[in-house]
């Protein structure tokens, strides 16, 4: 089976649509940005992914669906630093520091998420910014954004 486009996301399905038999493809965060790859579901089904559009995969993306079955993307958990700034000043300080290091980050209402790095952990300790190291799933890829200093 070759998948060339995403058919939706389980987050947008009704409860009755979610009752289909589900197979999952477990991906590493770094694989979410790959348009072309060969994967195997948790039921042993081999799938080729060759996306026509240059989009990143996300947790819950539907790779295949029929009347009774669907194959969705799941994301393996990974080692993260969950940064919990108490003030806007702390948030600005750590965001500036992480930006200078060109580290990709993700944000929730109250947290900044970065992939574990012992140097960032040392920085957080030295700045006194609260954080926890946690194994957690993220819904989308950590992506570097290229730019120039010219």
Curated annotation (Swiss-Prot):
GO terms for biological process, alphabetical: protein folding; protein-containing complex assembly; urea metabolic process
Localisation per UniProt entry: Cytoplasm
InterPro entries linked to this entry: UreE, UreE_C_dom, UreE_N, UreE_N_sf
Transmembrane feature ranges: none
Keywords: Chaperone, Cytoplasm, Nickel, Nickel insertion
CDD domains: UreE (cd00571)
Pfam family, one: UreE_N
Molecular function in Gene Ontology: nickel cation binding; unfolded protein binding
GO CC terms in record: cytoplasm
Function per UniProt: Involved in urease metallocenter assembly. Binds nickel. Probably functions as a nickel donor during metallocenter assembly.
Sequence similarity: Belongs to the UreE family.
UniProt-recorded name of the protein: Urease accessory protein UreE
Source organism of the structure: Staphylococcus aureus (strain NCTC 8325 / PS 47)
């Amino acid at each position: 089976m070759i998948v060339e486009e995403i058919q939706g996301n389980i987050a947008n399905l009704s409860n009755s649509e979610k009752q289909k038999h589900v197979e999952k493809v477990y991906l590493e965060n770094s694989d979410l940005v790959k348009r072309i790859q060969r994967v195997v579901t948790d039921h042993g089904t081999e799938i080729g992914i060759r996306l026509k559009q240059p989009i990143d995969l996300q947790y819950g993306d539907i790779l295949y669906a029929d009347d009774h079955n669907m194959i969705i993307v799941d994301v393996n958990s990974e080692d993260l630093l969950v940064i919990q700034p108490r003030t806007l000043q702390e948030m600005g300080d750590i965001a500036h520091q992480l930006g200078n290091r060109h580290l990709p980050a993700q944000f929730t209402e109250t947290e900044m998420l970065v992939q574990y790095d012992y140097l960032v952990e040392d920085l957080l300790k030295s700045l006194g910014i609260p954080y926890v190291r946690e194994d957690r799933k993220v819904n989308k890829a950590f992506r570097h954004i290229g730019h120039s200093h010219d």
